[in-house]
A protein has these predicted regions:
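Membrane-helix entry/capping segments
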Residues: 1-4, 250-268
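A short amphipathic helical element positioned immediately N-terminal to and/or at the very start
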Residues: 3-15, 84, 88
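A generic "structured core" feature
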Residues: 8-22, 96, 125
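Short, strongly hydrophobic transmembrane alpha-helices
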Residues: 19-44
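Short aromatic/hydrophobic contact patches that present stacked aromatics
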Residues: 29, 227-229, 264
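Hydrophobic, regular-secondary-structure patches
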Residues: 42-124, 131-134, 167, 215-216, ...
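Mid-to-C-terminal secondary-structure elements
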Residues: 126, 131-146, 154-256
């Protein structure tokens, strides 16, 4: 039987069983559309999960002079100096990665005051740069974060944790552009952080100020060490980004070949 005869026979069979053929074609079409829909939904879900983890700071890692997760017996390594941290930030060039420098200038003992309201003396004061909020997975609920100009000029501006804002402002108040004091030092509020809850190491009872401002206003504060944080857009870039960061940090710390790392790197 020739090809032409086969095609003719198939067409006659389709015409003879038109209803059955239409049902079969419809079922196949519906099945294909359902499969495409499922695959599209999976891609969207994966993108949403990656985005949510990025919002939580999961696409980042930190370089410190101690291990955050330890039994307390670990001896801290030499402090990471401001010069070392800024040198790292300047030299780190991994793809689309971005770097933040921060340090706790007052640990759990600052008082924040506005008019006749004030917090308990249990507030952390962090000096941070323009990338800290993004890399740390914070969200600004009101106002904004720091600009590069405010970092350069050591501006007296502050972003308040949600618990701090609630303590010194009422729900009817608009805290933005209001003046407050931190341990009797004046600052202007430019932003409020969205609440993270008690599981995030008291991040709601802290205030953020520009790193340059912190070094100027609280120069005698007991800074243990600076923290370098690195964020990447793609989770698949984490391991190579950590590898590059390790190599650069060894150069910054002037470690010789064979010497152990005198810093720790931990994923967020």
């Amino acid at each position: 039987m020739t090809l032409k005869e086969n095609i003719s026979l198939a067409l006659r069979a389709i015409r003879a069983n038109r209803l059955r053929s239409m049902i079969t074609i419809t079922i196949i079409a519906i099945g294909l559309m359902a499969l495409i829909g499922i695959l599209t939904a999976i891609d969207a879900l994966e993108g949403s999960i990656s985005s949510n983890f990025a919002t939580l700071g999961a696409n980042s890692f930190s370089i410190r002079n101690f291990n955050e997760i330890s039994d307390g017996d670990e001896t801290p390594k030499p402090a990471i100096s401001y010069k070392e941290a800024t040198n790292f930030k300047k030299e780190y060039q991994f793809r689309s990665a971005y770097v933040s420098i921060s340090s706790v200038f007052i640990r759990g003992s600052a008082t924040v005051k506005q008019a006749d309201k004030k917090t308990n003396p249990n507030v952390d004061v962090l000096g941070v740069d323009e990338n800290f909020i993004t890399i740390g997975g914070y969200t600004i609920s009101s106002g904004r974060g720091f600009s590069a100009t405010e970092l350069e000029s050591a501006a007296r501006v502050v972003v308040l944790g949600s618990d701090v804002a609630k303590k010194i402002f009422t729900e009817k108040d608009n805290p933005i552009d209001k003046g407050i004091s931190i341990n009797n030092q004046y600052f202007r509020v430019i932003g409020i952080l969205e609440a993270k809850g008690s599981s995030f190491m008291q991040s709601d009872t802290r205030v953020l100020i520009p790193l340059t401002t912190a070094r100027s206003v609280f120069p005698q504060a007991g800074i243990d060490s600076y923290v370098i944080s690195v964020g990447v857009d793609n989770p698949a870039d984490m391991e190579p980004a950590i590898g590059d960061a390790t190599g650069l940090m060894r150069q910054v710390r002037k470690l010789r070949i064979g010497e152990e790392d005198d810093f720790t790197i931990s994923k967020s």
